[in-house]
């Protein structure tokens, strides 16, 4: 029997195969580190008298806690400042490359890895962060790990793991204008639920996926965890190779040729069997937004807020009632009539140059509504520099948006960019949990196109609503 893409990468990295109920011992090719989940791991090494086994396969960047304004000033919050300072000391002591605030390559860890060419097909990638699945867009087996596992990888460059199940997400057809990969993944999560992918590696396949850019693919894989999955993957192809060629850490010359020949073998075999399969028709998809407090509570933008009274399942009805109460929404309200206070464009989901270009195209010649605040936060300093070279920052500021430095920003309430209680946002990030963007904040997950149109109209909107 043939093997799936995930199985091929897994098999290639087994250091020791587990017997019986024992896990396999897997080699890790790339370990990404940031300031939040690493302090205890480094302290564990220190207490045990251990060194980092492969500092050359480890990269650190400051992203979660960093401010996106006044980056030349000391960090005001004492906890955030301590975590950033601790990362700097740990990286210096253990010989790990670090991209600190203000560095030309600093940014969100899942934006930095791919843009440097560190994320490559057929590799294993881990990070103490849920959205490590982003890197699966390259055909890498990439997943988030906990702090104790971070320490294990630092010490041994391996992880003991049991094989994951595999699920095919087949997306056939052609996306309509105005529909993006963010809409696709929100539709996938709405279809299978936030627990539908639990224990699985999701492989996104089909003609619609093949037509996507690498940045669009990263958006989809990024949110695999929101369906409960361990990872998301896409088989590498010419689009992948074109993105990687010439990047700082990509192979060169004959090594590039050899790498591409190997990468071309990283496709699911025709006779391979998935443990589960799901199919979506890309032709039928429209812009998607979330209305509730988990990424699975999403609907097409043209829909209305659901009515709990119409839901037969008691637990689902209760969850809907609870979400609507927190979100301050009334059943039956058209989503297009939901007004927002803030629009956030950024994050490891949608903070890349392609995302900024898409939003800028919508905002060009238009103004952000007077009652709306819009934050535009590039995913990395490299993205910021490129955007400024293209004049995108001028489009944003002319429209009335704020142009910031790189960081996780308003994706999570760990830095100064937060919502206030009751404040409502349209956000291109990945999670809409209660308090995710700040205590009492209300989050609607959207694509960059919907974010830009919403900023102009002041209510959840798509670009077609501006015509």
Swiss-Prot record:
- Coiled-coil regions in this chain? none
**Which Gene3D superfamilies does UniProt cross-reference here?**
Aconitase, domain 3 (3.30.499.10)
Q: Which reaction does it catalyse?
A: (2R,3S)-3-isopropylmalate = (2S)-2-isopropylmalate
InterPro entries, sorted? 3-IsopropMal_deHydase_lsu, Acnase/IPM_dHydase_lsu_aba_1/3, Acoase/IPM_deHydtase_lsu_aba, Aconitase_4Fe-4S_BS, Aconitase_4Fe-4S_dom, IPM_dehydratase_rel_enz, IPMI_cat
| A UniProt-annotated Pfam family | Aconitase
Which cofactor is recorded for it?
A: [4Fe-4S] cluster
Q: Where is this region: Disordered?
A: 417-445
Annotated metabolic or biological route of this protein: Amino-acid biosynthesis; L-leucine biosynthesis; L-leucine from 3-methyl-2-oxobutanoate: step 2/4
Q: Where along this sequence does the record place binding of [4Fe-4S] cluster?
A: 348, 408, 411
Task: Relate the protein's function as given in its record.
Answer: Catalyzes the isomerization between 2-isopropylmalate and 3-isopropylmalate, via the formation of 2-isopropylmaleate.
Q: Which family does it belong to?
A: Belongs to the aconitase/IPM isomerase family. LeuC type 1 subfamily.
PANTHER family to which the protein is assigned, alphabetical: 3-ISOPROPYLMALATE DEHYDRATASE, HOMOACONITASE, MITOCHONDRIAL-RELATED
* Protein name (record): 3-isopropylmalate dehydratase large subunit
Please tell me the species this chain comes from. Answer: Saccharopolyspora erythraea (strain ATCC 11635 / DSM 40517 / JCM 4748 / NBRC 13426 / NCIMB 8594 / NRRL 2338)
């Amino acid at each position: 029997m043939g093997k799936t893409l995930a199985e091929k990468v897994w098999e290639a990295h087994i250091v020791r195969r587990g017997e019986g109920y024992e896990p396999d011992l897997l080699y890790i090719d790339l370990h990404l580190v940031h300031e939040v989940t690493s302090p205890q791991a480094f302290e564990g090494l220190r207490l045990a008298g251990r060194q980092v086994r492969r500092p050359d396969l480890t990269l650190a960047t400051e992203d979660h806690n960093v401010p996106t304004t006044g980056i030349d000033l000391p960090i005001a919050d004492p906890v955030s400042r301590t975590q950033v300072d601790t990362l700097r000391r740990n990286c210096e002591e253990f010989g790990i490359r670090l991209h600190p605030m203000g560095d030309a390559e600093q940014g969100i860890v899942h934006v930095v890895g791919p843009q440097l060419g560190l994320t490559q097909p057929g590799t294993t990638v881990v990070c103490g962060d849920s959205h490590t699945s982003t890197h699966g867009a390259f055909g890498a087996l990439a997943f988030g790990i906990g702090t104790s596992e971070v320490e294990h990888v630092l010490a041994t460059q391996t992880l003991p793991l049991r094989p994951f199940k595999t699920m095919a997400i087949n997306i056939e057809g052609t996306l309509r204008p105005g529909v993006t990969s963010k809409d696709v993944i929100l539709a996938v999560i709405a279809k299978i639920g936030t627990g539908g992918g639990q224990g699985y590696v999701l492989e996104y396949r089909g003609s619609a996926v093949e037509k996507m850019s690498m940045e669009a693919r990263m958006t989809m894989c990024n949110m695999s965890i929101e369906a409960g999955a361990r990872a998301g993957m896409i088989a590498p192809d010419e689009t992948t190779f074109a993105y990687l060629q010439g990047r700082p850490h990509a192979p060169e010359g004959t090594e590039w040729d050899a790498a591409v020949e190997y990468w071309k073998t990283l496709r699911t075999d025709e006779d391979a069997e998935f443990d589960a399969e799901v199919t979506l028709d890309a032709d039928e998809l429209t812009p998607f937004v979330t209305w509730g407090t988990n990424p699975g509570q999403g609907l097409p933008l043209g829909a209305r807020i659901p009515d709990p009274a119409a839901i037969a399942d008691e637990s689902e009805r209760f969850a809907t009632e609870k979400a609507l109460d927190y979100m301050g929404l009334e059943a039956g309200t058209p989503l297009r009539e939901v007004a927002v206070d803030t629009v956030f464009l950024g994050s490891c989901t949608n903070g890349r140059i392609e995302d900024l270009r898409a939003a800028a195209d919508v905002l060009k010649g238009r103004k952000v509504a007077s009652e709306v605040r819009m934050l535009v936060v590039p995913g990395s300093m490299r993205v910021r520099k490129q955007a400024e070279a293209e004049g995108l920052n001028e489009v944003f500021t002319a429209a009335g948006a704020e142009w910031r430095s790189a960081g996780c920003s308003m994706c999570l309430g760990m830095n100064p960019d937060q919502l206030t209680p009751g404040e409502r946002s349209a956000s291109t990030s990945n999670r809409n949990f209660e308090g995710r963007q700040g205590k009492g904040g209300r989050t609607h997950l959207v694509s960059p196109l919907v974010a830009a149109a919403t900023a102009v109209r002041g209510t959840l909107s798509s670009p077609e609503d501006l015509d």
